[in-house]
């Protein structure tokens, strides 16, 4: 059974802002923890979540982990992505979809905050 990791960022009209997600996707592919790794944007950019899900399914994913590349569990995560997960499950009944927690709060995030603050001083 192949498990896909689908990283989801908000999306931006600026390519350089979207590049962060593409870099993470590339690094996750190199690690090899998941058979399939794709990236998608909630809005303003492509690929959409639906398009990236199609890529996962066409590569044989039986399970797709939707991982919000967001810092907090706001409206986009709790409402929008939850609704999208439900729609994807309905549209792809042979595939299991799970929605992971966003990046923060996580103990490692505190270390990044400290590091960034020190770099700025």
Functional labels for PLM-detected ranges:
Residues 1-121:
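Active-site-proximal alpha-helix that buttresses catalytic centers in soluble enzyme cores
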